[in-house]
Amino acid sequence: MKIKAKNIVKIYDQKLPSELKALDKVTTEINQGEFIAIIGQTGSGKTTFIQHMNALLLPDQGEIEYLYFDSKNQEKKLVVQKPRFFRKKLKFINEIRRRVGVVFQFAEYQLFEQTIEKDIIFGAVSMGTPKNEAKKIAAEIIELVGLDQSFLQKSPFELSGGQKRRVAIAGILAMDPDIIFFDEPTAGLDPQGTLKMLEILDTLYKKGKTIILATHDLDSVLEWTKRCIFFKDGRIIYDGDTYSILANNKFLIENKMLPTNLLNFREKLIKIGYPISNVRSVSELISEINMLIQKETNAD
């Protein structure tokens, strides 16, 4: 599946000044097989954007185009605009939500007060999967998100915050969407929990899912993604290579997105193939990355 957002505008309160938009002429594309980071501070528009991609919200202006192949392998196109009538909305909303999944930051609100197995089975059955087959899917998916079979018989109130997020991911995976958005999946997790969560996302990506990770933490995305979409005040102010942002010291400082752990950050860059020397400050690190990017540009 491919998603094209074209000049999306969202205004929650029409009485507010016109410049106070939750989304302001947002235009971007999400292609099949990408692992993208959506970066921005709290209130920048990240979550509102995600809610539009999943049809939880509809744009006040602009349109969202979905390109996908149906069960007969025929290419389909679905264009979403603000509908005039509710009946028109029903024609596309189920198809979008079947193909575009969302795991929100507060995952416990996506879980029912029943066993984890029933939670996961519900997602599969809602997409037309027979119940017996859905039970087998639940057993496979629970291990995919790093939990053993014993968790299937537990209830949500028995789980930690990180475990609840994994179960929420399992419920979405049971619906087998093409694209999955994760809204602040590492928020509130300890370093070990953060690493495990990112490893789960990377595993899903390698299995062919399109993954979009929304976060305000620059450190947690550099090892895993190469493209990022940077939101500020409801607008996209950058959409491109993650590391190219680091070539602009002023941009990072103005948007308060400097890496918090310089040593850890340097090690991540080396791990993915950037030969960074022993730098002593963020400014030195940025300067060295700038030279590497320039060298790669000249080579091309």
UniProtKB/Swiss-Prot annotation:
Annotated S-S bridges: none
The record, for InterPro entries, names: AAA+_ATPase, ABC_transporter-like_ATP-bd, ABC_transporter-like_CS, ABC_transpr_CbiO/EcfA_su, ECF_ABC_transporter_ATP-bd, P-loop_NTPase
Record the organism: Mesomycoplasma hyopneumoniae (strain J / ATCC 25934 / NCTC 10110)
Organism superkingdom:
Bacteria
Q: Which UniProt keywords apply?
A: ATP-binding, Cell membrane, Membrane, Nucleotide-binding, Translocase, Transport
Q: Under which EC number(s) is this enzyme classified?
A: 7.-.-.-
Name the lineage: Bacteria, Bacillati, Mycoplasmatota, Mycoplasmoidales, Metamycoplasmataceae
Q: How does it assemble?
A: Forms a stable energy-coupling factor (ECF) transporter complex composed of 2 membrane-embedded substrate-binding proteins (S component), 2 ATP-binding proteins (A component) and 2 transmembrane proteins (T component).
Q: Provide the protein's localization.
A: Cell membrane
Q: Where in the numbering of this chain does the ABC transporter domain appear?
A: 3-258
Name the record gives this protein: Energy-coupling factor transporter ATP-binding protein EcfA2
- What family is it from? Belongs to the ABC transporter superfamily. Energy-coupling factor EcfA family.
Q: Does the keyword Cell membrane apply?
A: yes
Membrane topology recorded in Swiss-Prot or TrEMBL: Peripheral membrane protein
List ligand-binding residues for ATP.
G40, Q41, T42, G43, S44, G45, K46, T47
Spell out the molecular function terms from Gene Ontology: ATP binding; ATP hydrolysis activity; ATPase-coupled transmembrane transporter activity
The EC category is: translocase
Q: Which gene encodes it?
A: ecfA2
Q: Does the keyword Mitochondrion apply?
A: no
- PROSITE patterns with a match to the protein in the record: ABC_TRANSPORTER_1, ABC_TRANSPORTER_2, CBIO
